[in-house]
Amino acid sequence: MARVRLFASARDAAGTGSDVIAGDTVAEVLRAAEDRYGPRFTEVLGTCRVWVNGNDVAPDAALGPDDEVAVLPPVSGGTT
């Protein structure tokens, strides 16, 4: 099981900032998250980057029991 951290609009869509979700790969964990959190989360997920332990990874990347999956929506802002 991987610890999943959700930020900004992903957190809002899921209704939580973190969860523990079973899956052997990033893709399996994300599919399980979509099933758990519903269509609004699925829509937001399509705009997000997914990192594992601070690294950008492919969907087929294997996950271990202590891995942390971060779902990061695009950010903007700052000063001009």
List PLM regions with ranges:
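Ubiquitin-like/PB1-type beta-grasp interaction modules and other compact soluble beta-rich domains
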Residues: M1-T80
